[in-house]
Amino acid sequence: MPLKETTGKVVSDKMNKTIVVAVENRISHRKYAKTMTRTKKYKAHDENNECAVGDIVTIQETRPLSRTKCWTMVNILSKSFHN
């Protein structure tokens, strides 16, 4: 079974070797057919602490690493230019 991969924006990097990634999904409302954006936040493992807030990253599903962390950062698609 292939592992799930998704892309999102880093919203927090305050924890050691852990980042919080916000993933936006566009869905259509069943009744009104309006397109809505749903955001979900995932904690992901960042082994080298190389991500910063604002980076666009790809994360991949993995075995549970802690109580709330079961994703790992695969690569950084674009770096942010924050201080």
Swiss-Prot record:
A Pfam family this chain is assigned to: Ribosomal_S17
Subunit structure: Part of the 30S ribosomal subunit.
A GO-annotated cellular component: chloroplast
Similarity comment: family membership: Belongs to the universal ribosomal protein uS17 family.
Native source species: Porphyra purpurea (Red seaweed)
GO terms classed as biological process: translation
Protein localization: Plastid, Chloroplast
Role of this protein: One of the primary rRNA binding proteins, it binds specifically to the 5'-end of 16S ribosomal RNA.
Protein name, UniProt field: Small ribosomal subunit protein uS17c
Alphabetized PROSITE patterns for the sequence: RIBOSOMAL_S17
Protein origin, superkingdom: Eukaryota
Database matches in SUPFAM superfamilies: Nucleic acid-binding proteins
Major location category of this protein: plastid
Keywords: Chloroplast, Plastid, Ribonucleoprotein, Ribosomal protein, RNA-binding, rRNA-binding
UniProt KW Repressor keyword: no
